[in-house]
């Protein structure tokens, strides 16, 4: 299964996969043409402001196999291994050559620590090739007081983006960027419908490519390609196998999904930030621009990194029901404990409704380092009954 020939024969999908596989290409061309690029670390950096300023947002990502020469000098080994790999590219000059500035949101506790390390590193070793850094300090509790505080925080970030761009950003430009992002999210929802329907036609691996390519290219161009993929996929073969929902660690490439799909499962959804959660909520044009951005990022489905256990239980129940998944795979990397705290209560809730779960916790990264993992996936999938529908 995984990425099939029918998908690769689609010119639109092939174009998205080329961006996904060669993530620096568009940004390099953008800078060559005189544009500016802003790197994003954390899933709560508002693209709308960056796009409104005429700059290109790109996601900071790991590089499997890259020696962590600089990281080992500064970070403890108990950091999330993916974040350690991301830190290496920030500190060794890789991103200093590729982006003009770096925006960091406090999406996880480990990313907050990364920001503090970078801030101190820029202070005591200013010769290090670290790009200019801005930190977005959201409050994640959903009440009016915190909403006002978040609006003030985003006003400060807006001023920073204006400084990076060398010009002011108007409310009209933010609203226009919000509309562009909304169109992109709608196109991705149309794609997701072809995963979640009774006869799914897009694999989880293919979906990761379609979604993840948005992090490295111009947004309107991505929307057009996604819509063409949706049209092409109507004729792709129907997928057969137990319907599985994936939750846990972000998957920045398709390697792990390919293992699960090779075991015979159909991944119909996920709640991590390189998947479905990224396009979960729209920018509301009826609000003032800053409030609309706050609403969009703060009222998305709850993340395991910044939510109470009860909130995560309800959120996962909703997502599993929406995807009509037959089972749930929990998968977390070593030193990424937050999601594992939710698991006992989530397992209890799901299994009380007849939805089996499998937990893979404290896993080595990258996934191929886990001996016998493919066999464990096959064993779990073999216990599941049925095919493309639940119930």
Predicted regions, residues:
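A charged, amphipathic alpha-helical module
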Residues: 2-36, 151, 155, 159-280, ...
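Acidic/His-rich segments in extracytoplasmic proteins that coordinate ligands and/or metal ions
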Residues: 85-163
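Glycine-rich, highly charged phosphate/nucleotide-binding loops
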Residues: 75-93, 304-318
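Redox- and metal-dependent alpha/beta enzyme cores, enriched for Fe-S-associated oxidoreductases
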Residues: 43-44, 49-61, 247-319
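Anionic-ligand anchoring segments at beta-strand to alpha-helix junctions in alpha/beta enzyme folds, i.e.
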Residues: 52-77
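Peripheral docking tails and interdomain loops at the edges
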Residues: 2-6, 344-391
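C-terminal hydrophobic structural anchor segments
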Residues: 309-354, 358
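Metallocofactor- and cofactor-centric catalytic cores in central/energy metabolism, strongly enriched
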Residues: 2, 18-27, 31, 35-43, ...
């Amino acid at each position: 299964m995984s990425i099939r020939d029918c998908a690769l024969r689609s010119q639109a999908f092939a174009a998205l996969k080329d961006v996904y596989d060669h993530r620096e290409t568009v940004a390099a061309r953008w800078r060559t043409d005189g544009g500016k690029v802003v790197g994003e670390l954390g899933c709560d950096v508002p693209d709308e402001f960056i796009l409104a300023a005429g700059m290109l947002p790109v996601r900071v990502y790991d590089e499997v196999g890259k020696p962590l020469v600089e990281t080992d000098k500064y970070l403890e080994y108990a950091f999330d291994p993916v974040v350690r790999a991301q830190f290496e590219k920030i500190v060794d000059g890789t991103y200093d050559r590729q982006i003009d500035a770096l925006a960091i949101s406090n999406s996880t506790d480990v990313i907050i620590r990364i920001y503090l390390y970078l801030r101190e590193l820029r202070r005591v070793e200013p010769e290090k090739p670290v790009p200019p850094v801005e930190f977005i300090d959201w409050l994640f509790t959903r009440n009016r007081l915190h909403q006002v505080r978040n609006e003030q925080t985003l006003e400060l970030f807006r001023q920073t983006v204006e400084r990076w761009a060398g010009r002011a950003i108007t409310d009209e430009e933010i609203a226009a960027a919000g509309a562009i992002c909304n169109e992109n999210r709608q196109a991705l929802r149309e794609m997701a419908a072809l995963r979640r329907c009774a006869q799914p036609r897009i694999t989880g691996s293919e979906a990761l490519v379609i979604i993840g390519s948005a992090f490295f290219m111009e947004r309107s161009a991505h929307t057009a390609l996604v819509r063409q993929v949706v049209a092409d996929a109507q004729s792709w073969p129907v997928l057969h196998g137990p319907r599985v929902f994936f939750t846990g660690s972000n998957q920045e490439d398709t390697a792990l999904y390919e293992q699960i799909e090779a075991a015979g499962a159909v991944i119909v959804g996920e709640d991590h930030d390189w998947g479905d959660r990224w396009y979960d909520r729209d920018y509301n044009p009826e609000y003032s621009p800053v409030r609309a951005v706050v609403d969009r990022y703060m009222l998305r489905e709850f993340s395991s990194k910044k939510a109470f256990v009860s909130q995560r239980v309800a959120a996962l129940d909703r997502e599993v029901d929406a995807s009509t998944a037959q089972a749930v795979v929990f998968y977390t990397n070593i030193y990424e404990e937050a999601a594992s705290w939710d698991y006992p209560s989530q397992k209890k809730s799901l299994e009380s409704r007849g939805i089996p779960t499998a937990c893979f916790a404290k896993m080595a990264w990258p996934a191929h380092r886990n001996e016998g993992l493919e066999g464990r996936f096959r064993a779990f999938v073999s216990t599941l009954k049925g095919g493309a529908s639940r119930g």
